[in-house]
Design a protein with these regions (language model features):
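C-terminal motif of bacterial Sec signal peptides marking the signal peptidase cleavage site
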Residues: 18-22
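Short, solvent-exposed, charged loop/turn and helix-capping segments
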Residues: 76-100, 113, 117-118, 154, ...
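Charged, amphipathic alpha-helical oligomerization/scaffolding segments
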Residues: 35-45, 49, 68-75, 79, ...
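Bacterial N-terminal signal peptides that target proteins for export
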Residues: 1-12
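Immediate post-signal-peptide N-terminus of mature secreted/exported proteins
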Residues: 23-71, 159-163
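Short, charged/polar, low-complexity loop and linker segments
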Residues: 49-52, 75-88, 122-133
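A charged, solvent-exposed segment within the mature domains of Sec-exported extracytoplasmic proteins
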Residues: 118-163
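Short, charged, amphipathic alpha-helical segments
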Residues: 34, 60-68, 90-98, 126-138
């Protein structure tokens, strides 16, 4: 009977185990969904900071939050872009990336406009009220649209993988 060398056999088994464990292309749908939703939900912290600053009429802080938020969104977009899409995911990752880009556009443009208008209002310019209302409506509608698109994609993803 032939003797099998234990070390080479053990080393081979270890290499196979590591290769199988590191195959990132085969992902768990629940983990994939959770990771994407965590990235999206992390924006809530910045939204809350923005709301607190705006409600307190601290527009200098609001501008600081806005800039920080856009940086966080850039990182989040990059993180999701680098993720391997789950095989046959036809929309969730795309919806999340598009949603993050839309949040960034709101933070970059719409909140900047709103902060500028609120500063003018605080300085006594009462003529900006209609513009403020229009900005608030645009921001809220944008948030609703983003949430709707991500929720729609998430529901479709759940139906597909919840078999």
């Amino acid at each position: 009977m032939k003797r099998v060398k234990v070390i080479p056999a053990f080393l081979f088994a270890a290499i196979v185990a590591v290769c199988l464990a590191s195959c990132g292309a085969v992902q768990n749908p629940v983990e994939y969904n959770n990771k994407l939703m965590t990235v999206v939900n992390d924006n809530e912290k910045s939204m809350n900071e923005m709301n607190t600053a705006m409600a307190g009429q601290d527009y200098t802080k609001a501008e600081t939050v806005r800039k920080s938020w856009t940086e966080k969104l850039d990182k989040a977009i990059g993180e999701v872009d680098k993720m391997d899409a789950l095989k046959e995911d036809e929309g969730l990752k795309t919806a999340v990336v598009n949603g993050l880009k839309a949040y960034k556009k709101i933070a970059d443009n719409d909140y900047k406009t709103l902060i500028d208008l609120r500063n003018k209002e605080k300085s006594g310019d009462a003529t900006v009220q209609l513009q403020i209302q229009a900005s608030l409506t645009k921001i809220n509608n944008g948030f609703d649209s983003i949430a709707g698109q991500i929720n729609h994609a998430s529901t479709a993803f759940e139906k597909k993988y919840n078999k």
